[in-house]
């Protein structure tokens, strides 16, 4: 009788199935890590933008002199956010002593996250879909077309 060596087809399919399960789990973990990293980057960017605006325009009585190109150039920052959209600065039309940081180009999920996030130093908390947050925004547009507005100032 001959001695055969090697693996059977069943054993190979079992190994491939196990590898598939491991791969799916790894992809899920990587996706979560990337989403968390992008959200942290946006938080850090907004803090840098707000600090820059306050340092550059703090001597004025209002923020009516806000200019996106000047502000982003002075703080050495690109207006592009990690989601492929942009950051924008505008004076609050209802109160020139306040300015609004806009985060454009968000998915519905990320928009909802940023609307309900408690933004430090933002003006009040806005009620949005039953959740308290320091920002406003409609998160019903298609992916990549949602915008969040965060108001800062007095």
Regions found by a protein language model. Give the residues of each.
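N-terminal single-pass transmembrane signal-anchor helix
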Residues: 1-34, 42
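N-terminal alpha-helical signal peptides/signal-anchor transmembrane segments
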Residues: 30-33, 43-64
